[in-house]
Design a protein with these regions (language model features):
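Bacterial Sec-dependent N-terminal signal peptides
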Residues: 1-36, 42, 47
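A conserved catalytic-loop motif detector
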Residues: 152, 168, 190-232, 254, ...
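Second-shell loop/turn segments in exported
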Residues: 54-63, 101-109, 151-160, 170, ...
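Active-site-adjacent, His/Asp/Glu-enriched structural segments that form or flank metal-binding
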Residues: 131-193, 200-208, 214-215
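A small/polar active-site loop signature that marks catalytic segments
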Residues: 218-351
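Active-site SXXK
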Residues: 96, 110-128, 185, 224-228, ...
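C-terminal soluble interaction/assembly domains
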Residues: 315-430
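Beta-lactamase-like hydrolase cores
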Residues: 32-94, 100-107, 171-177, 429
Length: 430
């Protein structure tokens, strides 16, 4: 189709104004569109917070911390708080005093900031040298090239067990000269109970399976092990199944991953499976077998009581924060963060694993200003109706701060995140 001479001026005009309208969109608005597409909880445009909001700035006529307190007071006047709640506690670790408190004792669902509670409890109970172990054992004897007996893969709930570890298991048998297993191959999953999911998990979520013997995050360890044995030319005469390893069994090889390796992914990427693995390590450390989530709850409660709070006020159901039954407070999270800060054996393992604002993990796309970037180190949390953030930062006066912010009853988590980011910016900005 050809344009006649009457259509050309209109076409040119429309093209010109379309170009101008696109070119004149503010940079922050274009960025906002990209962020809303990437935002998992909603594609609804965020209208409650304006990036140019004057409330974002501190009152320079007031001294620290009054200027911070005034600015946060003004943030709390936002319309979102007419229909939602926030619990918040900000603590100056150098001055050993509270900077700001608001509903800090109100019970709320922590979402994935529960992982910080799990991490601190684990480091306190297990220590920074703890390792997640998976064993390969056998019973019977090795006669020539034949293992006459049974082989046991003993799970210690290591979520990082991978292809290299599996190959190491197979290679260990090859180095013993074994080309035939005249017996069965068993999965020993006795380390924990048989519950495949956490208490209070939503049935329609994509939840991880809580097995103590995993391969590549799946409960298919024995199937893959047998397949790798066959590829290596090792023949099995028996069957596969689940059975606890006898005390008399011989250990062929053990594969380990450190607690630092687990915490790094658990906190930076908010990995729920890793958090539950840590929680069951806490439970197993009590000496109970099989370990249960209830055993871990008790350890968490013991730590809370030791820190001077009443553990019976809170509810714990899992280690990841997926459960609908977890209820904590900003006061509790800050008390645990203070405890970790005062204990270098905990802090040296916790701090490097927390997401860093504007740099990595779940904070990579948040708080990119010069004052917050690489400064705020905190754990994020998001479940339906809840957005949370807790961790550490260095304030504008050089003081070390720990904080917890839990937004509850919000339809769109982005609104909670923006409030949290502004609070952190107020603390960091000169």
């Amino acid at each position: 189709m050809q344009l006649n001479k009457h259509h050309i001026p209109l076409f040119i005009k429309l093209s010109f104004w379309l170009f101008i309208s696109i070119a004149c969109v503010p940079l922050h608005a274009q960025t906002e569109i990209e962020e809303s597409v990437a935002d998992r909880d909603t594609l609804v445009a965020d209208t409650l917070w304006n990036d140019n909001d004057s409330l974002f700035l501190k009152n320079d006529t007031l001294a620290w911390p009054q200027n911070v307190q005034k600015a946060i007071d003004e943030l709390l006047q936002n319309d979102m708080f007419k229909t939602s709640q926030v619990g918040m506690l900000i603590y100056d670790l150098d001055a050993d005093s509270v900077i700001y408190r608001h509903n800090e004792r109100q019970l709320m669902r922590p979402a994935s900031t529960m992982k910080v509670i799990t991490a601190i409890t684990a480091l306190d109970k297990l220590g920074g040298g703890h390792r997640f172990k998976t064993d390969l054992c056998y019973t019977g004897r090795i006669d020539s090239c034949t293992l006459v007996g049974d082989v046991y893969c003993v799970g210690g709930f290591d979520p990082r067990f991978n292809v290299d570890d599996m190959h190491a298991f197979v290679e260990a048998l090859r180095r013993m000269g074994v080309d035939t297993i005249r017996g069965n191959v068993y999965a020993d999953k006795s380390m924990k109970d048989e519950d495949p999911y956490g208490e209070g998990w939503c049935w329609d979520d994509n939840n991880p399976v809580l097995s103590p013997l995993l391969f590549a995050r799946k409960d298919k360890f024995i199937e893959r092990f047998v397949s790798e044995l066959q590829k290596a030319g090792i023949y099995i005469t028996g069957t596969t199944g689940e059975q606890r390893k006898p005390d008399s069994a011989n250990c062929i090889i053990s594969r380990f991953h450190t607690i630092d390796q687990i915490l790094m992914r658990m906190l930076k990427e908010s990995d729920n499976l890793y958090a539950e693995a840590v929680y069951y390590q806490i439970a197993a450390a009590t000496g109970n077998r099989p370990a249960t989530a209830e055993h871990a709850h008790r350890v968490v409660q013991q730590l809370i009581n030791k820190l001077g709070l009443n553990a019976s006020r809170y509810s714990f159901a899992d280690g990841s924060g997926l459960s609908l039954y977890n209820y904590v407070s900003a006061e509790l999270e800050v008390r645990l963060l203070r405890y970790a800060y005062s204990n270098q054996l905990i802090l040296n393992h916790l701090l490097p694993a927390l997401p860093i604002a504007g740099v990595d993990g779940t904070l990579k796309a948040r708080m990119r200003s010069p004052f917050t970037r690489s400064n705020v180190r905190a754990k994020t949390g998001t479940v339906m109706g809840v957005s949370s953030l807790c961790g550490y930062l260095t304030a504008s006066n050089g003081h070390q701060i720990c904080f917890s912010i839990i937004n509850q009853g919000i339809m769109h988590a982005k609104n909670g995140r923006r409030f949290q980011d502004r609070v952190c910016s107020i603390l960091c900005r000169p």
